[in-house]
Structure formats: C-alpha cells, structure tokens
Curated annotation (Swiss-Prot):
GO-annotated cellular components: membrane
Native organism: Mus musculus (Mouse)
Keywords in alphabetical order: Glycoprotein, Membrane, Signal, Transmembrane, Transmembrane helix
Residue ranges that the UniProt entry lists as topological domain Extracellular: 20-179
Protein location: Membrane
PANTHER family, alphabetized: FIBRONECTIN TYPE III DOMAIN-CONTAINING PROTEIN 10
Membrane topology according to the record: Single-pass type I membrane protein
Encoding gene (name): Fndc10
Protein name: Fibronectin type III domain-containing protein 10
Length: 223
C-alpha cells in the first residue's frame, strides 16, 4: 500500500489567519466510509508491463490555500486540479449517483506540450470508488493536459457509450527558482547589514584611535 504522506500533512494543517482559502464545495468531500482507492499506473514503453496494483486512502478536509495552491476546473465542472507549489497536483472529481453506478473504472490520460507536438505521460486506471488522485513531481514551466474518462460496465458498453473525457490544463510554476530568488534576496540583505556595521566600525576606529583627543592645558597656576 502506498499512502501519500504529503496529503495527510496538508489535510492536518490549518491555513493561517488572513490567508485566502478555496473551500471544498459540497459534493467534492468523500464520504466518511469511503473505501480505499485501487489504481494502476501504466507507464509508457513496451517493457513496462501492465503496472502494479496499488491502494491509496481518499483525501478529506483538503483546502487550497491561494499563496501556494491554484485550483483549475474542467469545462464540464466535474474535474478539478489543485496545482500546489511543491510541484504536485491533486485531482478531484465527482459524479451523480446514477452515473457512479454505471462506472467500471476511470482512465486518467496525461500529456504535455512540447515545442512542436504533444508527448504522452503515464496513464492511470482508477477504481470506481476513487474520487481523487495525486500527481507528484510535475515539471516546471510545462503545459500539462489531464483528461479523465469514465469507462462503463462491460454489460453496458453496447448500450451506454463511454462518457466524453473531462480535461483540464495547467502549468506548474518554477517553485525552485522562486526559492532561489528569495534566498538570494535574504543573503543580499544580510550582506548590506554587515557592510553598514563594518562602515560604522571603521568610522569609530578612525575617529577615536587614529586621531586621539588631547587634553587642554590647565589654566591654574602652579604654586
């Protein structure tokens, strides 16, 4: 089993006061008795095989804090992507009860835009009980496109056509570059403070040691 510790940490941390938060709308929060989510990652390439079956727990109480998180929605509104500053993306989706009974599996297709064409990335198959998925380690400044499609039950394939995929596009911000800029700004400020202290110290030494003050001769007559 692989449980995402990052999401558990995000769910447990409350947002600070004064920070804008995108609340979880009704219908997006998983049920208290929601089962484990089975999923399988199908990597690209002929030697990757069919993937390994894994399980993850649903995310509860997630809040998208605007300084470090951005929420994007698909055209149909049933798929949401929360782009976090740590280069991970949390996907959430919801279905009507009638639609949920017809779903056999969800297919999550991923691609990213290159200079002249689009390149596919890992494909994920998720069980019918899944309502969220964490996509870790996305690349900075790359335009991603994620599409979630509902695959119906085998008995209803000929009766009910597959639903059109809900897609969302996003670009992860270069968080590492922002951290470097912040660090360089902090270091530059420290250097400026040190230079000011050194200048004051040199001025003090020059004034008091290089040019010592002489006492004036006393005007009192000696007996």
């Amino acid at each position: 089993m692989r449980a995402p510790p990052l999401l558990l940490l995000l769910a447990a941390c409350a947002p600070p006061s004064g920070a804008a938060v995108d609340p979880t709308p009704p219908g997006w929060e998983p049920a208290p008795d929601a089962p484990w989510c089975p999923y399988k990652v199908l990597s690209e390439g002929p030697e990757t095989g069919g993937g390994r079956l894994c399980f993850r727990s649903p995310v509860r109480g997630f809040r998208c804090q605007t300084p470090g998180c951005e929420t994007l929605a698909s055209a149909g509104g049933s798929l949401r992507a929360h782009v976090l500053r740590n280069r991970s993306v949390l996907l959430q989706w919801r279905l009507a009860p009638a639609e949920a009974r017809r779903v056999r599996v969800f297919a999550l297709n991923c691609s990213w835009r290159g200079t002249y064409t689009r390149f596919p990335c890992d494909r994920v198959l998720l069980g019918a009980s899944c309502r969220d998925y964490l996509l870790p380690d996305v690349h900075d400044s790359v335009r991603y496109r994620l599409c979630l499609q509902q695959l119906p039950l085998r008995a209803e394939v000929a009766v009910v056509p597959p639903e059109l995929a809900e897609c969302v596009e996003f670009t992860a911000e270069p968080a590492a570059m922002q951290e470097i800029v912040v660090a360089m700004t902090a270091v530059g400020g420290s250097i400026c403070v040190m230079l000011v202290v050194i200048c004051l110290l040199v001025a003090y030494i020059t004034e008091n040691l290089m040019h010592p003050t002489f006492r004036r001769p006393s005007l009192r007559r000696q007996p």
